[in-house]
Each structure stands twice: as C-alpha cells, then as structure tokens.
Amino acid sequence: MRENPPGKGGRLTMEKWDLLDGDGRPLGQTLVRGDKLRPGQYHLVVHIWVEDSKGRLLIQKRAPHLKLMPDTWAVTGGSALAGEDSLTAAARELSEELGIEAAPSDLKLLGRLRRRNSLCDLWRLRRDVPLSALRLQKEEVADARWVSRGQLMEMVKCRRFHHYGSPYFDFLFRSLDGEPDILPVK
C-alpha cells in the first residue's frame, strides 16, 4: 500500500489509479488517490499472501504514522497504479514493502473479490523466506511475522489484524486449500 509516496527531490507525488467497472473493464479514466469514487467506479487492489512450506502466512504490521489502519497487522498489498495490471502490481508491492522479488510465474491468482470501492485480487506466493531476509519499507511497514491460520484468525477476533470480512477469509482459506477458484462478489 502506498500513502503519499515521496517523489524525486523529496516532493510528494500523486498516485493515479485506473477506473474500472464492476466487472473489471477499464472505464478509460484515471483517479488521483484520495479523490472520491462515484457509484459504479472501482479501482484495482492486490493482496499477496506469502505461504511457507509449513502452511504459515506472512503478515506485516502497518507503520504507526499511516492514516489508514496505523499500527495494524495486515496482508501485503496495495492499489494498482494507472497502466499497471494485477500481476505487475502484486510483484511491485511485494518488492516495495517486503523486499521479496517474485517472477510472474511464482505468483498464483487465487481470485477476485468485489468490495465497496475496489476489485481485490488475491495472490499467493509459496516461498520460505527468513524474516531476517526481508527488507521492510520503513515508510509503510513496521514489522513482519509468520503466523498459522489459527493465529491469524485469533488476531482478527482480537482486532489485532485488519478484518477484511468473513467472506474474504472463507474465500482465502478455500483457495489456499486448492478448492476451485470461485470469484465471489460482495
């Protein structure tokens, strides 16, 4: 995720998103981050779940100064930039936020969820990554850790992990277990 990313010379740059319809078709328009979406307009968001050989999931703690969900554990992800496809956005977010480089063939699309103002593509990367090998993006990420699914859901219950909604987690776990990809709409 990116909040007011620094540009050249330390100035803030405007992040632009492509506008999509509810089926993911481009509307031929862009929106500057922070501007309000109208009904029927969506932007593309990617969530990348890194899963190790023990079935644990890599989560990250958002930096304390962020406006949206500060000091909250969440999945790695963010909005696709204008002109960027979902796969490119997923690889970029992994690299920026955690320092994990992934080839396109390493990432598997689990499916897409329609949310209030976004179409959220869930991706999986299967990789054993030592925490010591991560390069956290200090502007956005304060910490990272591996958790089991049970630990993750306990964190959701105790409000220490962002609650994306029960349908989200149901879909995520079904997809990680290899059930057929379903594209539920919320």
Model-predicted segments: where are they?
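Acidic, metal-coordinating catalytic segment for phosphate/diphosphate chemistry
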Residues: 12-47, 53
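Nudix hydrolase/Nudix homology domain
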Residues: 11, 34, 70-71, 114-186
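A glycine-rich, hydrophobic loop/mini-helix early in the fold
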Residues: 45-77
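Short loop segments at secondary-structure junctions
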Residues: 23, 52-55, 63, 126-130, ...
